[in-house]
């Protein structure tokens, strides 16, 4: 499970087996047993959210938007 970055106790990562055919670029976020998955395109949106409150969801979206290029670089490098 490649970890792209950690911030404030949150782990931003993806899985090495992302389906066949592979799903589009996305990121998983976990903390304290709570998790979410976000699509990066066409805009950053939740695929699912399993427990993060609205304020935390807004923060997660802002983090992913700010680091979208980094996430894509790591994803593309891993799956190249």
Which residues make up each language-model segment?
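Negatively charged, low-complexity tracts enriched in Asp/Glu with abundant Ser/Thr
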Residues: 1-12
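A broad, low-specificity signal for short, low-complexity segments enriched in glycine/proline
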Residues: 1-2, 24, 33, 75-76
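Generic preference for hydrophobic/aromatic residues in regular secondary structure cores
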Residues: 4, 44-48, 67
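A short, structured beta-strand/loop element
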Residues: 15-54
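C-terminal structural segments of small proteins and small subunits
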Residues: 51-80
């Amino acid at each position: 499970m490649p970890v792209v970055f950690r911030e404030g106790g949150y782990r931003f990562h993806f899985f090495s087996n992302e389906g066949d055919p592979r799903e589009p670029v996305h990121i998983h976020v976990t903390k304290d047993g709570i998790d979410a998955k976000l699509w990066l395109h066409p805009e950053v949106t939740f695929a699912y959210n399993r427990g993060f409150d609205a304020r935390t969801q807004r923060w997660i979206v802002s983090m992913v938007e700010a680091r979208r290029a980094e996430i894509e670089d790591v994803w593309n490098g891993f799956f190249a």
